[in-house]
Amino acid sequence: MNKYLCFFLLVSGTIIAQSNYNKFSLEFASGYTSPVRPYLSGYNSNFSSFNHVNIGGRYMFSEKFGVRLEYVNDRFISSNDATAGTYFNRFGAQLVYNVGKDLDLWYITNESFGLLTHAGVGYTRSTIKKSQVVDQIGSVVIGITPQYKINDRSALFLDFSSVFNFKQHYRYDGSLISSDYVPVVGNHYNISLGIILYVGENRLHNDWY
C-alpha cells in the first residue's frame, strides 16, 4: 500500500511541476526546397528554390516528448520552363523528441541553444502546374531542428527535413512517371529558418526547463 501511495505522490508531483510550464507553441518557417527523385534528366537544379513555407503547432506532453501538427507548401517551379512544375500541399502529424535535454544543451549553453528531432506522416496533394491534375500522396517526414532562444516567449529555429513520398505518380517537373500509372517513392528535402512563439499563461516553456 505504501508503495502505491509513494508512486501516486511521485506522479502527482511530476504533473504539478510540469503544469508550471507552457506546453504549446506556434511555429512559422520559410526556406529552401529541393527534389531528389524522381525528375527528368537536367531538371533537378532548376526546381530547387526558396519556395518552402511551413506553419505548425506543437504540444509537449513532457519536457522531452510532444506532437506537432503542420501545413507545408512546396513549389517546384522551373526557371527555364513556365509550364513545368508541381505544387505540394502537405498536412501532417509528427512526434517530437527534445534530444537537447539528453545532451544538456540548455544547461551547457546557459539556456541559449536547444535541439529537437521529429518524425511522422502526412497527406500530400500534388498539383501538376501544366494540367492541374492532382496526385494524392502519402508522406513520411524525418528531421532535426536546432533552436536559439530569444526570450521566454520566442525562439529562432533552423530545420532540416527529408520527405519521402509514397505512391508518387508524377515527377517534380510534372511529367507522368509511367504510362501504366505505376507509382514510385519520391524524395525531396527542406531547409528552413523560422520562429517559435510560446503560448500559455505561464512564463516558461517546457523546451527550456
Task: Indicate residue ranges for each PLM-predicted region.
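Short loop/turn motifs that connect adjacent beta-strands in outer-membrane beta-barrel proteins
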Residues: 18-23, 64, 101-114, 150-153, ...
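Residues that define the transmembrane beta-barrel architecture of outer-membrane proteins
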Residues: 22-24, 47-53, 87-91, 111-113, ...
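Bacterial Sec-dependent N-terminal signal peptides
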Residues: 1-27
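Gram-negative (and chloroplast) outer-membrane scaffold detector with strong preference
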Residues: 59, 63-133, 189-199
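Predominantly the C-terminal beta-signal and adjacent terminal strand-loop region
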Residues: 71, 76-81, 86, 150-209
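Transmembrane beta-barrel strands of outer-membrane/channel proteins
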Residues: 26-32, 69-73, 117-123, 144-146, ...
